[in-house]
Amino acid sequence: MTQPLNRAAIVAAARRIADRDGLAELTLRRIAGELGTGAASLYRHIADRQELLLLLVEDLVAGYPLLDPAGVAPVEAVVRQWHAMYDHLVAHAWSGPVIADGDYALPSAKPVADHCMALLRGAGLDDAAAQRVYRAAWRLIIGHLMSRHPFGHLQGAPPQQDDFDWALRTLLRGALAE
């Protein structure tokens, strides 16, 4: 083992495995193998797989990009922020089902919610509409993450990333028109 064994090293190894192979392949034995240690030594730092998943989701939340809206039209700032979050989650394909399960509503995600809500209000939505768009945009992201079918029978269809952009902008236009 080239690095000291600690929670950060364990979470980094877990993220590499989950990103590469998916959550189904994320076992303490695999993490230990990647770190060059025995599985039992991991238990000095984490209690069990459930705690490992919690730490992995905390790590995911810590990586959410919060874009500065300065110099950008308010609606475009909202679109850019949600695209950045979408791109972050696409890089961690395992995140869709974990977020959708709803088991990890973490206090550390509050700054992300606050930032997104401020952008939505800045785009002209009242609190109630901003909350609805916030929830709908999350469901939109999760739906795109969990439904990665290429829909190849739609010849000439735009790329799926374009579908996300279209749906997000349509959601915002509809909410702003109310």
Predicted regions and their residues:
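Basic, helix-initiating cap at the start of DNA-binding domains
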Residues: 1-37, 47-54
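Helix-turn-helix DNA-binding motif, specifically the short coil turn and the N-cap/start of the second
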Residues: 38, 126
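Residues in the recognition helix of alpha-helical DNA-binding motifs
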Residues: 45-46, 133
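Short, basic, alpha-helical segments at the C-terminal edge of helix-turn-helix-like DNA-binding modules
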Residues: 58-63
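Hydrophobic alpha-helical connector segments
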Residues: 65-108, 127, 134-137
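C-terminal peripheral helix-coil segments that are non-catalytic and often amphipathic
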Residues: 150-178
